[in-house]
C-alpha cells in the first residue's frame, strides 16, 4: 500500500529571501509533485511564513485534496513589504508553529504517514551568537524527534555558511538532513518519492550516497563538519549549550591560527 506524507514548509521571508520567490516556488513544486497523485487525497500540506522576531508567523494549512495552484497563491511574502535584511531569524517561533500543527499518524484510509518539516532560510537563528529569550529551536528539535517529525533544512545563499553546521545538526537531531538550496528540489523529490514508494523512513535514506548528491555544485561539505555535528547532538541540550559550543570552536580556530 505504501506510505504517504504530511508536510510543513517553513519559509523565511526576509527581503533577500523574498527576491528569490520564483525559484523558491519552483522548488516547492518539486516537493509537491513528488507525492504521487494517488496519495495526495490523504496528505496535508502546511505553510508557515515568518519574517522578523517581532512578527507572528503566518500559517496556512491545505487539507486534501492538494492543489498546486492554490498552494502557489499563498506563497508570497505576507508581512512587511520592505522586508528585514539584517539580523537573526526567529527559527524557534517558526518551529513552535510546526509543533502546533494537527499532525496525524495515519490518514483516513489507515495508511502510515511520514511527517516532514522543511525549513528554508538564509540567516542566523536567534540564540546562536547572542542570548535570546524566545522559543529554543534545539529543544524543539528534540520534541520533533519524540513525535516522529523529521526536519530538513534548506540553506540559501552564501551567508548561511557561517552556521550551516548548526542547521545540519538541528536537522540530524530529528533524523533529517541539511541541503544547499541549489540541490533542494532534486534531493527532496527523490527522497520523498523513495519513502512513499519503498515504505522506508527519512533516517534510512540518509546514506553516504545521499550526501554525495547533497554536496554537488555547492560549498557544503558534510565531512568538514561531521565531528562538530555529532558533538552538538551528543553534548548540547539547549541553544545556550550550542552558543557555548560555537564560542569555544571559534576560540580554538583563533588559537590554531596564531600557534
Tell me what each language-model feature is.
Residues 1, 34-39, 98-113, 142-143:
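Surface-exposed acidic, glycine-flexible loop patches that form ligand/cofactor-binding
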Residues 2-114, 116-120, 157-168:
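Von Willebrand factor
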Residues 13-17, 52-55, 84, 123-127, ...:
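Solvent-exposed loop/turn segments at secondary-structure junctions
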Residues 40-45, 111-116, 146-152:
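Loop/turn elements at helix/coil->beta-strand transitions in domains of secreted/extracellular proteins
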Residues 47, 151-153, 175-180:
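Conserved beta-strand scaffold positions in the cores of enzyme catalytic domains, especially
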Residues 123-173:
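VWA/integrin I-like adhesion module and closely mimicked acidic/polar interface patches used
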Residues 178-259:
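C-terminal "exit" segments of structured domains
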Amino acid at each position: 500500500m505504501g506510505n504517504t506524507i504530511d508536510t510543513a514548509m517553513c519559509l523565511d521571508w526576509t527581503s533577500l529571501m523574498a527576491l528569490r520567490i520564483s525559484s523558491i516556488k519552483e522548488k516547492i513544486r518539486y516537493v509537491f509533485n513528488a507525492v504521487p497523485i494517488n496519495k495526495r487525497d490523504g496528505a496535508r500540506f502546511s505553510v508557515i511564513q515568518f519574517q522578523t522576531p517581532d512578527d507572528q508567523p503566518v500559517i496556512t494549512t491545505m487539507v486534501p485534496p492538494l492543489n498546486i495552484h492554490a498552494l502557489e497563491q499563498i506563497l508570497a511574502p505576507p508581512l512587511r513589504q520592505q522586508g528585514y535584511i539584517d539580523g537573526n531569524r526567529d527559527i524557534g517561533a517558526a518551529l513552535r508553529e510546526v509543533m502546533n500543527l494537527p499532525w496525524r499518524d495515519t490518514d483516513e484510509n489507515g495508511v502510515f504517514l511520514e511527517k516532514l518539516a522543511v525549513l528554508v532560510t538564509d540567516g542566523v537563528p536567534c540564540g546562536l551568537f547572542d542570548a535570546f529569550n524566545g522559543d529554543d529551536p534545539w529543544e524543539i528539535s528534540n520534541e520533533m524527534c519524540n513525535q516522529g517529525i523529521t526536519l530538513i533544512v534548506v540553506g540559501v545563499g552564501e551567508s548561511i555558511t557561517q552556521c550551516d553546521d548548526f542547521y545540519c545538526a538541528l536537522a540530524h537531531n530529528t533524523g533529517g538532513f541539511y541541503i544547499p538550496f541549489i540541490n533542494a528540489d532534486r534531493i527532496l523529490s527523490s527522497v520523498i518519492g523513495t519513502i512513499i514508494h519503498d515504505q522506508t523512513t527519512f533516517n534510512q535514506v540518509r546514506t553516504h550516497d545521499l550526501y554525495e548528491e547533497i554536496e554537488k555544485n555547492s560549498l557544503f561539505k558534510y565531512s568538514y563538519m561531521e565531528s562538530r555535528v555529532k558533538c552538538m547532538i551528543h553534548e548540547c541540550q539547549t541553544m545556550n549549550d550550542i552558543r557555548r559550543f560555537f564560542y569555544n570552536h571559534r576560540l580554538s580556530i583563533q588559537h590554531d591560527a596564531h600557534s
